[in-house]
Structures are given as structure tokens and as C-alpha cells.
Amino acid sequence: MLQPATSSVSATGAPSTDTVPAGQGRKVLRAALTTASAGLLVGLDTGLIAEALGFIGRDFHATPRMQEWIVSVLMVGALLGSLGAGVFSQRFGRRLALGSATLLIAVGALLCATAGIIGQILLGRFLIGMAIGICTFTAPLYISELTSGSMRGTMVSTFSMLQSTGILLGYLAGGIFSGGGHWRLMVGLPVIPAAVLCAGCALLPSSPSWLAARGRFEEARSVLRSLRGDVAVA
């Protein structure tokens, strides 16, 4: 069992910590905020599609039923994404799961923005939905495993706060682009922040709980030392 001065990882992989030195606290904060920003992407799509849907229906002569499918296919993808997120993140790690989700958002948004047929939009929306399902499962879990007890609740709730912020930004951006009917710019907007976050995921540490659960205690101890301070083996 790992027994740190300021944090610990049990044999079952559950981290436990109450205080974090100031220097390490900044590292934890950066990692947690990077992860929580996935909520911004989740909310951004919700706000953007609400503004873009009317223009998509006009350009593709989509029936009201088809427009409903454009919205609801995302929910189908989100359901499947959330169902598979646990298995994926447990096998490959939280960091890779989150990075894959942001990549799916970028690909899905790009498909929607360049669509020549309605089916391509449906496919793009489905991929975005899968990414949302993965993000909403993985991001809060990953944050809780990186942060100390004193900041865990605040950082996990930041994911939800940024999700609401993303919805607001989506509506605002939609209002700006809707003046010229530029729906392709609207639905393609998430490509940029998704690509940035995908690159940022490569700089995130592996979850110490995930490492410990797989018997990689030395690596888990190294991550904890980097994030939270000295770690000793009991």
C-alpha cells in the first residue's frame, strides 16, 4: 500500500488525501481545469445546434421529423458512449478515454460542417453524442482521482459549471453567425477547442487510482508525488 505524507493510494486504487502543498496544488489545479473544460465542449454543441437547426432544415429541405432526428441522434450516441465509457476508461485509462472523446467531437463537428447530405450530419451528431457520453462519465471520475479531498467537490462541480457556460457561449456564437445564415461555421466551431483539448490531454498525468488498480504502484506513487507532494511506501 502507498502511504504518502499528504495523499495515498490504497491497494484497491482509491486515492485519499486532505491537504496538498501549494506547489503541487497548482499542478493539480491545472490538470483538473483542463479536464473540466470538456464540459465546455459538451455545452457548446447544445447551444450551437439550437441556433443552426433551422438553417440546416432550410438548406437540406429537411422535414420536421428529420430535424428531430438531427437532435435526438445525439442522445442515442450519448447513451452508447456512456455505456461503453466505463469499460474503455478502465482498460485504457481515463486520459486516453477523454482524449478520444475530444477527438470524436472534432471529427463529428467537422463532418457536420462539411456535410453535403443529411446523412453526414446525422453521423457527425452521433459521433458527438458518443463523445458527450464518454466525457460526462470520464471527466468527473478523472477529476476526483486527481484532486485532494479539500478541492475535489469544487473541481468536480466545475465540470457542470463549464457545461452551462458552454451552452451560453453556443447560443451567443449562434446568434452572431445566424445573421448571415452561416450554420456551417456554427456547427464547425467546436473543432478548434476540441483539438486544443485533445492536445492538452497528452500532457495530463495518468490517474493514480487507475495505475494502482492495475498493480502499477511505482507509477502511481510518481504521479502522486508530482501532483500532491512526497509519497512514501508503507
Predicted segments, located by residue:
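Transmembrane-helix signature of 12-pass secondary carriers
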Residues: 1-234
